[in-house]
């Protein structure tokens, strides 16, 4: 039986992870749950899965949770704060850590899991976007293992030869017969919206993804295709891919989750219903397979599968992310931090949808982008970029 810590248990990925556990009670046991401030959902999870530990972001939320659990006779030990989250990621009895805390808050707990030599089920984009080389070096040093949870990276992983799967981030694609990686994305809810109408799009409209069920921040990132830009950066690190070995395609149906092109002309793809429980179950059970709870793909009900190249005028955030990778980790860190602030401002209706990309670019142009040599350096770049972004938002929304 595999023993789990779930970082970000009350979020979308965390809830889906627990659903896979629910479908496979003899295969997985939850040792620790870590979340932000959603006390009600955490209480439900603790009462159902009886973890040994539960960690909340702050002491107030932890106290509320403790009272609720005591009322139900739960023996789960309640803790709070980032240090406790890091300790849960490194518990001796835990072998697998689901890293699903959204944003820079997930960096240190994920790093703690890596340094403890765990198998990390990586759903936190920021880990590689901001700390790609640092994290990949730490993985090698600690003999940890990264298994990508993002549907696209998981699809690529499944389509790659075992020689690359067992040497992620360091294997030479060309030496293993791989020509390129094809990263697919739906194009989001505004793929066919006239360009002149994009400025008027509301947060609710941006969060109506045509295929996937996601949180609001990730939904906006899908609408701008910043999500795909961050995935591009991740893929470069995960698969040791050069720019010429990467292709990005718009695939509106979200049936083919990504592909790998081989030197002999073959293209291997992973297909499935757009349900995050599939890649989650794959990483949890790898190299075996378990039931995920997802519906099987019905080929007879499929319409045409279509593909097109992304329009960078429609999706400037995608281009921005691709260019940031070439500038280095300070640039990708600053871009990610700026984007978190600008998306939050859009969701709060402080700025327009079309302001997001321009503000992100403005932050990059105003930053002194010196390469970080440690996670502490990364966090400093992150903090400075956030402050610059906040000032830009205030200036624009006056």
Curated annotation (Swiss-Prot):
Obligatory cofactor(s): Mg(2+); Mn(2+)
Key word Manganese present: yes
A Pfam cross-reference name: DXPR_C
Enzyme class at the top of the EC tree: oxidoreductase
Protein's GO biological process: isopentenyl diphosphate biosynthetic process, methylerythritol 4-phosphate pathway involved in terpenoid biosynthetic process
InterPro entries tied to this protein: DXP_reductoisomerase (IPR003821), DXP_reductoisomerase_C (IPR013644), DXP_reductoisomerase_N (IPR013512), DXPR_C (IPR026877), DXPR_C_sf (IPR036169), NAD(P)-bd_dom_sf (IPR036291)
Enzyme Commission designation: 1.1.1.267
Binding residues for Mn(2+): 150, 152, 231
GO terms assigned for molecular function: 1-deoxy-D-xylulose-5-phosphate reductoisomerase activity; manganese ion binding; NADPH binding
Reaction equations catalysed: 2-C-methyl-D-erythritol 4-phosphate + NADP(+) = 1-deoxy-D-xylulose 5-phosphate + NADPH + H(+)
Stated family: Belongs to the DXR family.
Protein name in UniProt: 1-deoxy-D-xylulose 5-phosphate reductoisomerase
Source organism of this protein record: Salmonella choleraesuis (strain SC-B67)
Name of the encoding gene: dxr
């Amino acid at each position: 039986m595999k023993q789990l810590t779930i970082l970000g248990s009350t979020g979308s990925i965390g809830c889906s992870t627990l659903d896979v556990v629910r479908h496979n009670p003899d295969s997985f046991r939850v040792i620790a749950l870590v979340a932000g401030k959603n006390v009600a959902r955490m209480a439900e999870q603790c009462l159902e899965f009886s973890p040994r530990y539960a960690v909340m972001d702050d002491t107030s939320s932890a106290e509320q949770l403790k009272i609720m659990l005591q009322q139900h006779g739960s023996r789960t030990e309640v803790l709070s704060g980032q240090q406790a989250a890091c300790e849960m990621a490194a518990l001796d009895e835990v072998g697998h850590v689901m890293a699903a805390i959204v944003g820079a808050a997930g960096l240190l707990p994920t790093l703690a899991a890596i340094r403890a030599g765990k198998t990390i089920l990586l759903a936190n984009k920021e880990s590689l976007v901001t700390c790609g080389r640092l994290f990949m070096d730490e993985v090698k040093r600690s003999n940890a293992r990264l298994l990508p949870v993002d549907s696209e990276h998981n699809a690529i992983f499944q389509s790659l030869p075992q020689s690359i799967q067992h040497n992620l981030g360091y294997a030479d694609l060309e030496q293993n017969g791989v020509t390129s990686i094809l990263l697919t994305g739906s194009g989001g809810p505004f793929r066919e919206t006239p360009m002149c109408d994009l400025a008027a799009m509301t947060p609710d409209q941006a969060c109506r993804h045509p295929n996937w069920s996601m949180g609001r921040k990730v939904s906006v990132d899908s609408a701008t295709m910043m999500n795909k830009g961050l995935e591009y950066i991740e893929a470069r690190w995960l698969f040791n891919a050069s720019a010429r070995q990467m292709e990005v395609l718009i695939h509106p149906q979200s049936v083919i989750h990504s592909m790998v092109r081989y030197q002999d002309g073959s293209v291997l793809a992973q297909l499935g219903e757009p349900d995050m429980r599939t890649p989650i179950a794959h990483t949890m059970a790898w190299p075996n397979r378990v039931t995920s709870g997802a519906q099987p793909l019905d080929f007879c009900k499929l319409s045409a599968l279509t593909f097109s190249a992304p329009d960078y005028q429609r999706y400037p955030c995608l281009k921005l992310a691709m260019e940031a990778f070439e500038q280095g980790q300070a640039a990708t860190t600053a871009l990610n931090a700026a984007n978190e602030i600008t998306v939050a401002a859009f969701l709060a209706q402080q700025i327009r949808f079309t302001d997001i990309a321009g503000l992100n670019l403005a932050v990059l142009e105003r930053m002194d982008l010196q390469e970080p040599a440690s996670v502490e350096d990364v966090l400093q770049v992150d903090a400075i970029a956030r402050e610059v972004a906040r000032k830009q938002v205030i200036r624009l929304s006056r």
